[in-house]
Design a protein with these regions (language model features):
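Short, solvent-exposed recognition patches
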Residues: 91, 188-274, 285-288, 292
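Short, hydrophobic/aromatic-rich segments at coil-to-beta transitions
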Residues: 31-37, 57-63, 121-128, 149-152, ...
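An acidic-aromatic
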Residues: 43-100, 152-169, 173
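Intrinsically disordered, low-complexity linker/loop segments enriched in Gly/Pro
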Residues: 91-139
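A short, surface-exposed beta-strand/turn
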Residues: 55, 75-76, 140-152, 249-252
Length: 311
């Protein structure tokens, strides 16, 4: 590290651990007003976005606007995506570990304070989250020293290959005016999925990567049929994947897998006496993890996530 960086860094850096920084990032995500421009990279494709975060009607609102191509906007309120001009349940900024999950990250990742950097002209501290196995990706986060806002995020695979990068090129702590927090064009409202009770006959994984637990079970609309598709979300506190289950009936479908950047999808037909079910594992985990989860799926009476193994 250069002496210049060392001089600009707060003395408290030497005393604060990685977990303290993660908690500060989580708090900043919901408390710090800011605006800026960031670049998003995936699969050697680049896109530029403007972002505004501030308070409106007692809520923390974050608006993201695509600066290239067809107009595209996303709006989040209190951390929940409430509208997307493309009608997709996706968000661009990295999901940070919830406060209650920070302590257990050490089970799945080695947490390191790497050093200091400058991003968008601001002094940042660099955190590394190194996976302890092959079932999750590695992360490098550059956190603004003054605010705790994440200014740069890099995701890499087991071979050190870049999968995804987000980096601010301009960042200001000036609170945005209220009009900047309102979408300027059509922005389709995102309906919340309905929570459901576990069906009597539910495909459940018999294996999960170490550290992953079930965190949410819900129903999502099925555009091809009247029956809803059940969805179960699993997370290790940082990485996550969902398992979608759809009764097949007389439909014909083959197993398949795909990957785009860090996001993988593995579809596998699960046979049972009560009828076949197509399960699809989707998430930002290595393909080896998604495939093993999909192949472990079984239909059992009153299946629960507590019955799985993590070896």
């Amino acid at each position: 590290l250069s002496s210049a960086f060392a001089a600009m860094a707060p003395a408290a850096w030497a005393e604060e651990g990685v977990q303290a920084w993660l908690l500060r990032m989580q708090q900043a995500q919901q408390a710090v007003p800011y605006q800026g421009v960031f670049v998003y990279e995936r699969e050697s494709n680049y896109a530029t976005y403007r972002v505004w975060q501030g308070e409106r009607d007692g809520h923390v609102v974050q608006r993201i606007q695509d600066q290239e191509g067809d107009p595209h906007e996303l709006l989040q309120q209190d951390g929940r995506l409430i509208c997307n001009s493309r009608g997709q349940h996706v968000s661009l900024l990295p999901r940070l570990p919830a406060e209650e999950h920070v302590a257990r990250l050490v089970e799945s990742y080695e947490l390191r304070m790497v050093g200091r950097s400058r991003v968008a002209g601001r002094v940042s501290t660099v955190l590394a989250l190194i996976p302890r196995d092959k079932y999750r990706y590695g992360h490098e986060w550059h956190v603004d020293a003054q605010t705790g806002v994440l200014l740069k995020a890099v995701m890499i695979n087991d071979d050190g290959q870049l999968l995804e990068r987000l980096q601010f090129s301009h960042f200001s702590t000036e609170a945005p005016a209220e009009p900047a927090l309102i979408p300027q064009g059509p922005c389709e409202t995102m309906a919340a999925a309905e929570p459901v009770v576990t069906p009597v006959l539910a495909p459940m994984p018999q294996w999960l990567p170490p550290g992953f637990i079930e965190v949410r079970r819900q129903q999502v609309p099925n555009v091809r049929a009247e029956l809803a598709v059940s969805s179960v979300l699993f997370s290790d506190g940082l990485s996550s994947f969902s398992v979608y289950s759809e009764p097949m009936g007389q439909q014909l479908a083959a197993d398949a897998r795909s990957q785009l950047g860090p996001t993988v999808a593995v579809a596998h037909r699960v046979q049972s006496e009560q009828g076949d079910v197509m399960v699809t594992v989707v998430g930002e985990v290595p393909l080896v993890a998604a495939e093993r989860v999909a192949l472990s799926m079984r239909v059992h009476d009153h299946a629960t996530a507590s019955e799985v193994t993590h070896d």
